[in-house]
């Protein structure tokens, strides 16, 4: 019986597991899922938790709900992978494998910017998101209760205006109103900045749609500064350079969304193949020269035949990678991995957004926001099952 070990219960890991459940139940394979936490969390909803608009429990799924007969779950942190001995070492266990699936997710990347890792909070996981939400409210409370009002306490700087940054800024539109009402603060005093070194906003959308997103945020009091090279961070500021001029923006809440990398364990395990925690896989998502090891999700840099660059790491491609690997390990004739890009949606809070989905269908406003929720509901179903999706309130 083939012994399959899956590292990580993210999108790719759980879709791999779902594809193996039938074979595991039939006793054709033995599956072990290893994850640091007892839960899976929806990375695509971390921005909502970070703003404080929803509790973290709303985006978490207990792993015990997805473990079925023939599947074992080990809650522990992976510290080493020995590819020669075919062993996974965690803090407590040694786990042998015949087939290994590595889906250990992403880590923040600050590109060596001075003070960034020490001072800015990344939207990296559930605990990080909860910290941002708590810091944001603590600072508003501090402003409201202090005799000497310091506007930096009700100021927020977001480094990065990619999808993660823009969606977080969209959530802040609602949260700002809520906190100002709660603590009796004039909304006009609040300063929120979205910074990016890029000259354009959301290049995956048409200019009409990216302009729509920018206008929505700016109409709600958020300042977008493009072409802003972020040079450093202090405990209460970002140092930026715009058109050759350096300036310091002050804020007590500093958030970083401008960079991610794959898991550092990738560089340690495959030093000659991995760069910034990502490994260029074969067309079957395996490690070159190691057909028994699959790389999926944020750790995988998949370059399709005929292309020059890897696809961006998204939940969409992670789900497709997991489904492919689960099918391939089960012995189904799947051929090479082919990614189907079904489009992109950017929410701007829970009532607005922009969307450009498969077939060139575009929408904006409330319709796009609802489309995002429908896509999220479908993703949870693909990861688990209908009952679990209902339990986690992802079916609308």
Question: Model-found features: residue ranges?
Answer:
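C-terminal auxiliary extensions adjacent to catalytic cores
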Residues: 350-396
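Internal hydrophobic alpha-helix adjacent to the cofactor/substrate pocket in enzyme cavities
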Residues: 174-177, 315-342
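FAD-site-proximal beta/loop scaffold in flavoenzymes
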Residues: 118-150, 248-320
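Beta1-alpha1 glycine-rich phosphate/pyrophosphate-binding loop at the start
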Residues: 1-72, 166-204
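FAD-binding core/adjacent interface of flavoenzyme oxidoreductases
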Residues: 1-3, 73-155, 159, 244, ...
């Amino acid at each position: 019986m083939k012994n399959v070990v899956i590292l990580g219960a993210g999108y790719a890991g759980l879709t791999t597991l779902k594809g193996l459940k039938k074979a595991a139940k039939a006793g054709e394979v033995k599956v072990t899922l290893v994850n640091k936490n007892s839960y899976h969390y929806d990375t695509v909803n971390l921005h909502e938790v970070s703003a404080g608009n929803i509790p973290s429990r709303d985006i978490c799924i207990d792993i015990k709900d997805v473990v079925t007969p023939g599947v074992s779950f080990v809650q522990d942190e992976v510290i080493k992978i020995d590819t020669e001995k075919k062993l996974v070492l965690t803090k407590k266990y040694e786990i042998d494998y015949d087939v290994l699936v590595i889906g250990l997710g992403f880590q923040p990347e600050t590109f060596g910017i001075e003070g960034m890792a020490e001072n800015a909070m990344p939207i990296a996981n559930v605990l990080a998101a909860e910290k941002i939400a708590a810091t944001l409210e603590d600072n508003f409370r501090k402003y409201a209760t202090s005799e000497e009002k310091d506007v930096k306490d009700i100021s927020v700087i977001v480094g990065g205006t990619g999808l993660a940054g823009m969606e977080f800024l969209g959530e802040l539109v609602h949260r700002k109103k809520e906190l100002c009402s709660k603590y009796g603060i004039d909304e006009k005093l609040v300063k929120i900045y979205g910074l990016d070194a890029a000259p354009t906003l959301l290049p995956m959308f048409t200019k009409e749609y990216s302009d729509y997103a920018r206008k929505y945020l700016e109409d709600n009091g958020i300042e977008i500064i493009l072409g802003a090279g972020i040079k450093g961070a202090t405990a209460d500021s970002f140092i930026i350079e715009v058109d050759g001029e350096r300036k310091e923006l002050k804020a007590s809440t500093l958030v970083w969304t401008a960079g991610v990398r794959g898991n550092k364990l990738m560089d340690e395990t495959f030093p000659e193949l991995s760069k910034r925690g990502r490994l260029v896989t074969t067309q079957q998502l395996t490690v070159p020269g190691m057909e028994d090891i699959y790389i999926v999700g944020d750790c995988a840099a998949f370059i399709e035949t005929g292309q020059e660059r890897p696809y961006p790491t998204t939940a969409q491609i992670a789900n497709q990678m997991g489904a492919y690997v689960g099918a391939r390990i089960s012995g189904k004739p799947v051929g090479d991995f082919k990614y189907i890009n079904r489009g992109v949606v950017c929410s701007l809070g829970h009532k607005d957004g922009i969307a450009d989905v498969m077939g060139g269908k575009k929408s904006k406003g409330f319709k796009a926001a609802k489309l995002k929720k429908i896509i999220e509901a479908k993703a949870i179903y693909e990861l688990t099952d209908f009952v679990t999706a209902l339990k986690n309130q992802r079916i609308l």
